Swiss-Prot record:
InterPro entries: Ion_channel_UNC-93, MFS_trans_sf, UNC-93_regulatory. The gene is UNC93A. It is found in: Cell membrane. SUPFAM superfamilies: MFS general substrate transporter. This is Protein unc-93 homolog A. It comes from Homo sapiens (Human). It comes from the Eukaryota. CDD domains: MFS_unc93A_like (cd17406). Its main location: membrane. It is a multi-pass membrane protein.
Length: 457
C-alpha cells in the first residue's frame, strides 16, 4: 500500500475510534444531563475552550510537537472527558469539557494540516494536481470518520435499548415537542425517563476504551509529518515564537478569509442544533432517549457516504454546485421542521430529517476543509486554526442559547445565518474568478500549481 494512503488511513481510523466515543456522548449530553442544563452547559464550555485554544494553540503545538505529537496530546483530552462522565457533576464535566476544548482545535488543525501536506506531497510525486489529491484524501478521511457516528450511536442504542419500554404519550403532552419546545414547559415527556446508572456506566466504559485505543493507534502507526516534509521539501526553517503565535490573526489581512468566517460559524451552529435541539426536542421528547442513537446513525451513515462522493464529484462539478446543494437541502429541512408536529407514529420522518441533514453536512465538512487547505495552502496551520475558532464559536452560540430560546427561534436564526453565509461565499468565488493568478509569496510553490489553486478551487 502507498505510504501516503497508509498514513491517511491511520489518521482516519484513529479519529474513527476517538469520535465513536465522543460523538455518542455529545448526542446524549442534552438528554442525559438535562437537570439545570448541565449537559448543554458542558458542551458550551467545551466549545468555548476550543474557541480560546483556536486563537493561539494550534500553530504553537504543531510547530513544537509536529502533527503527530499534537494529535496524540489532544486525543488525551477527549479520553479525560469520557472519564469525567463517570462522575457527572458540575465539578467534573465542566473541567474535563474545558480540557477537551483546549485540545480540540489543535487536534483538528493538525489533522487538516497533515492531510493537506500529505496530499500535496503525493500529488507532486505522482504528477497529479495537488487540489485533487487533497480533496480525495479529505473524502477518504470523512468517509471513515463520519461512520464513527454510526458505531457510537449504535452502541448507545443497543445499551439503552435494555431500558424498559416507555408508554406512548398523550396527544396534549406532545405539543411541547418539536419547534414548539421552549424548554420552559413542565409537561412530562419521554425525556424525563433516564436509563439506569448501570447502563450509563456500561456505555461510558465502552466509550473510554475506544478513546484509549485511538491514542495507541496513532502513537504506534502514524508516520510523523515532519519526516515526510524532509523527504519532499528539505529541512523546515525555524519559525520565531511570536510569529507562530500571531499567525492566526495575521491571516485576516487576506480579505477572502474575512468573507469565509461565516462558513465555519454556520457549520458549528447547524451541528449544534442537530446534536442538541433535534435529539432532545424532537427525538427524545417524542420517542425516548433509546431512539437517539438510531436516528443519529442515519445521519452519520448518510454523511459518510456523501463525504466520499463529494470528494470524487467536486473535481467534475466544482465546489460551488455542492455548496448550493448543501444550502438548498438545509433550507428545506429547516422549513419542514418549523411546520412539522412530531408524533410517535411518524417514526420514518425522524430518520428522513437526519438523513437529509447528513447530505448537507457532508458538504460543509468536506468542502470547507478542502477550501481552506487550497486557498491558504502556505498558511495551513493558521488557516485551519481560524476555521476551528469560528466553528467553535458557532457551537458555543448554539449550546449557549439552547436553554433560553424556543426551537422555532433557533431555526429562524439558522436560516438567517445560512443566507448570509452563501452571499459571503459567493463573493469569495467572484474574487477568485477575477484573480486567477496571484503574486508569489516567498517560498511559494511553482506557478503551475499556484494557478491551479487559484482558478480551479
Amino acid at each position: 500500500m502507498d505510504r501516503s494512503l497508509r498514513n491517511v488511513l491511520v489518521v482516519s481510523f484513529g479519529f474513527l475510534l476517538l469520535f465513536t466515543a465522543y460523538g455518542g456522548l455529545q448526542s446524549l449530553q442534552s438528554s442525559l444531563y438535562s437537570e439545570e442544563g448541565l449537559g448543554v452547559t458542558a458542551l458550551s464550555t467545551l466549545y468555548g475552550g476550543m474557541l480560546l485554544s483556536s486563537m493561539f494553540l494550534p500553530p504553537l503545538l504543531i510547530e513544537r510537537l509536529g502533527c503527530k505529537g499534537t494529535i496524540i496530546l489532544s486525543m488525551c483530552g477527549y479520553v479525560a472527558f469520557s472519564v469525567g462522565n463517570f462522575f457527572a457533576s458540575w465539578y467534573t464535566l465542566i473541567p474535563t469539557s474545558i480540557l477537551l476544548g483546549l485540545g480540540a482545535a489543535p487536534l483538528w488543525s493538525a489533522q487538516c494540516t497533515y492531510l493537506t501536506i500529505t496530499g500535496n506531497t503525493h500529488a507532486e510525486k505522482a504528477g497529479k494536481r495537488g487540489k485533487d489529491m487533497v480533496n480525495q484524501y479529505f473524502g477518504i478521511f470523512f468517509l471513515i470518520f463520519q461512520s464513527s457516528g454510526v458505531w457510537g450511536n449504535l452502541i448507545s442504542s443497543l445499551v439503552f435499548g435494555q431500558t424498559p419500554s416507555q408508554e406512548t404519550l398523550p396527544e396534549e403532552q406532545l405539543t411541547s415537542c418539536g419547534a414548539s419546545d421552549c424548554l420552559m414547559a413542565t409537561t412530562t415527556t419521554n425525556s424525563t425517563q433516564r436509563p439506569s446508572q448501570q447502563l450509563v456506566y456500561t456505555l461510558l466504559g465502552i466509550y473510554t476504551g475506544s478513546g484509549v485505543l485511538a491514542v495507541l493507534m496513532i502513537a504506534a502507526f502514524l508516520q510523523p509529518i515532519r519526516d515526510v516534509q524532509r523527504e519532499s521539501e528539505g529541512e523546515k526553517k525555524s519559525v520565531p515564537f511570536w510569529s507562530t503565535l500571531l499567525s492566526t490573526f495575521k491571516l485576516y489581512r487576506d480579505k477572502r478569509l474575512c468573507l469565509l468566517i461565516l462558513l465555519p460559524l454556520y457549520s458549528g451552529l447547524q451541528q449544534g442544533f442537530l446534536s442538541s435541539e433535534y435529539t432532545r426536542s424532537y427525538v427524545t421528547c417524542t420517542l425516548g432517549i433509546q431512539f437517539v442513537g438510531y436516528v443519529m446513525i442515519c445521519f452519520s451513515a448518510t454523511d459518510a457516504l456523501c463525504s466520499v462522493l463529494y470528494g470524487k464529484v467536486s473535481q467534475y462539478t466544482g465546489r460551488a454546485v455542492l455548496y448550493v446543494l448543501g444550502a438548498v437541502t438545509h433550507v428545506s429541512c429547516m422549513i419542514a421542521l418549523l411546520l412539522w408536529r412530531p408524533r410517535a407514529d411518524h417514526l420514518a420522518v425522524f430518520f428522513v430529517f437526519s438523513g437529509l441533514w447528513g447530505v448537507a453536512d457532508a458538504v460543509w465538512q468536506t468542502q470547507n476543509n478542502a477550501l481552506y487547505g487550497v486557498l491558504f495552502e502556505k498558511s495551513k496551520e493558521a488557516a485551519f486554526a481560524n476555521y476551528r475558532l469560528w466553528e467553535a464559536l458557532g457551537f458555543v452560540i448554539a449550546f449557549g442559547y439552547s436553554m433560553f430560546l424556543c426551537v422555532h427561534v433557533k431555526l429562524y436564526i439558522l436560516l438567517g445565518v445560512l443566507s448570509l453565509t452563501m452571499v459571503a461565499y459567493g463573493l469569495v468565488e467572484c474574487v477568485e474568478s477575477k484573480n486567477p493568478i496571484r503574486p508569489h509569496a516567498p517560498g511559494q510553490v511553482n506557478q503551475a500549481e499556484d494557478e491551479e489553486i487559484q482558478t480551479k478551487m
